[in-house]
């Protein structure tokens, strides 16, 4: 097997709302994720179908404590360094900096927390990769404006960006504007703080919010380049190929349209203009975007420097209603199971070759450097009586995907900046709110009900990934 580039950014990725905890400490304000409960009410709230803008005593909220990285970050980053991380992707919690989302002055305690975190990364030679907004909308702005449906969210976001760019310009080189921006259409409350009134045109609201996020992203890219010459700002897509279930032309067409829909946001962020097909589709659907005169120029001038994406699985599309089957945990839905692939315990198809296909699709489409910022296997781990955790299934999954990455680099010639596995440490699942759906190399003693000591333990995969990084991917055994 060929080697990876010497400057390849190996590492792991987390999100503030899934790992930090301390939701009401250090001056932090309430965010949308803080009111998304665990249990049967979780999905109605995530999808904007049930209004919940405050916490109550009847629900458990996983993000409130999460894995308490707010108080454990030095221990956790030391463990990342032990594995040899060269890069750590994390997000800044908007409301830790601006508790109400648009405060005139930032919360100094929140700024100081990230100063300390970045300094800890730098101490070990770990490059931070920062997501500016990772499923994170201030509750105060949702109450005030209705989330990203309102144009005023753009200015609030850019104000937030201006603060963190100026504060961390000497500590952070790599930035992402929005996490999995395309998930706004599928999880509108999580992705954009959207709530829908009875009779409201939901598609109009979602695409209006999408336009506002796209304009905000472009303005952030432009601002970052002004404040931090030489920095790199990327977009972030929930990626994964859509395969036709059969070679029937209708299935092939359905898969092609699903792929095109999924790349809509990145088309705009990378090319600086709306694709013609998207304009026609909105026209047919009666969607009329409210825009401002300089929006086109803003989008054109604020294109991203690289394409980052998450990849967990591919999906299989058919128009045959008898073959349709909803895959558990597949938020995009509308897919049938692929008979040629095994699936995880949560119904996600395991498709390493699909990663290589996706990488080639993205590079052929955009001709920009790529960065895989999420990839991993959610699984139930067992702690043995001696405290060991044998997660060979996770090693097998990651090995197969890294092998395909190497082929994409050395055989296909693709420029790949780095690879950050999702959840290098166990954390709260964004979709289900579970802790038992574990991704990490590091086990965290906590269960779905919030019980546990929060003790950190190394799994077998910890030592395996350490070896992978040390050999630049040459030793995957």
What residue spans do the PLM features occupy?
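Short, flexible active-site loop motifs that bind/organize anionic cofactors or intermediates
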Residues: 63, 70, 101-104, 345
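Catalytic domains of carbohydrate-active enzymes, especially glycoside hydrolases
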Residues: 72-93, 302, 306
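Internal amphipathic alpha-helical repeat/solenoid segments
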Residues: 65, 69-78, 99, 110
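Glycine-rich, proline-tolerant flexible connector loops at the mouths of alpha/beta enzymes
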Residues: 92-106
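Active-site region of glycoside hydrolase catalytic domains
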Residues: 1-57, 81, 100-102, 111-477
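Active-site mouth loops of central-metabolism enzymes
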Residues: 58-72, 149-152
